[in-house]
Amino acid sequence: MGHPNIEQRKFTFCSMLAAYDLEHLITQCPECTRFFAACCPHETFGGDLALPNKKICHHFQLVFIDGACSNNGRDNAKAGLGMTIGDDEEYCWSITMEDAVDPDGPRTNQCAELLAAIEGLKQLENVNRIQAIDKAMGKGDSHHKPARRHTNDLRSTYIVVADSEYVVKGITEWFPTWRVRLS
């Protein structure tokens, strides 16, 4: 059911990619400017790194997120979120944390980081939904497709890229416990 590159909601690149620098593993589509994780270079799959000038596989969709807070945890704390899925302005968002976004408790760095991950995934899903509607109406572009080996997957895989250990552990280790507590 799952993908071999994802275990406990944590993405890792295929071991065949170990020789590549991270800058080569994060790809950007020249047509839509969105960010993606490189597919495996096994020649049998014809992955992104196997052939020069190959079209970018749009399966592993990346959302880069960050959250920040000044006066962390105090009454006068100010916090904000930043998310991007590509270079175009339409793919970059910043949100001020206000009561409408986070009505409970004081503003904190950790809360801002987690909300950035949630909002980033929402934005990514919204963009994909709009593109699917456009495609269904004959307005969409045809380059947004996964490599051959992903054609049986019903959905693309969304990957949150964060510099926050709290977010990474929250998604990969603590999420099952949080889900049980909230249900």
Predicted features along the sequence, with ranges:
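RNase H-like nuclease fold core
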Residues: P4-N5, C14-L115, K122-I130
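RNase H catalytic domain
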Residues: C69-N72, I118-S183
